[in-house]
Amino acid sequence: YRYQHRGNALKTRYRQYWDNSELNAAIYTASVETYKKNRELVAAVDANYAARIGNGWNVNMRLNRASQDTFMRRYKFDSSTSLKSEVVAEKLDTERYYRVEASDIQGLSSSDTSETDPTVLPHVFYEKIGPGLRETQTVKTEISAIQVDNDEGHDMSRWTGNVELSDRIDTGGIITEVKTGIIGSYYSVQKKPAGATTKTDDMDRVTPQASIGWRAPVSLAGSSRSIVLEPRLQFAYIGGKDRSADIPNRDSADYRIDEANLFLLNRYQGYDYLRPGSRADMGVSAVANDALVGDVTGFVGASYRLSGKPSSGLTVNDDDNLSDIVASLGINPEMP
């Protein structure tokens, strides 16, 4: 690449395939104008290696680094504002999922420093979903351990165990779903930003959870259209001690209520932010087929806080008991 009055750049691509693995690498070298110099020697690499090893393990490795923060974007090689290098090993079988991950992020924004570029060394996760004592029961077990450094100024370790039992009872067109679970976590927070109100300490937390819900699907059909409506109501309880002011919220900070997590027992889906209290979740989903319009899907729902302190991510005003209304609509026309 030649840039008039701004220098030259070279991009080299290399690919190699083997029976159970492949390598795909791009190397960038340049002598170009940067915000520091009229001509600066810069380089970057984006290399991916994937392999299938052992008994069902998939290993993916990526090295993605740049010697200078802006040249990849300025010369339109890559528009990313951060580069992530990682090693991930995964295995999935009928009932179990294993994941081992180590990663490092290089921030390319002017505000990024070594204190805000997260490094994970490592993150180990195990999940098993199997039958319970009854045919309608399911038991989910999760075990995870993580060490993360420089996550917006935090250095911390977390060990977590989660067990959840689900049961389903069908009675006369009404489906009753019962869930119980317990999450146990142990934290070791080694460092925090100067302005953080959380603690630098070793902390533990035990969070029991339970919910009961009902669904009542109703089907209607005509000559050229059909529709299935499913009203749903759930009551959920989250117990234990509220430690949200003590524990840094790193894995649930981006939580927002939506259709996918509205009825989950732990709808934050992370472990750092667990707020005790009770709530009522309600919604109606619809699936319709019309000869003229095609396939139509829709949902509307909300959550109401019955007890406990407000949770972030539910409403614009966190003091409201009623969450924001969650709604979606999808139309897939049938083409002739």
Language-model features: locations:
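Outer-membrane beta-barrel proteins and related beta-barrel translocases across Gram-negative bacteria
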Residues: 1-336
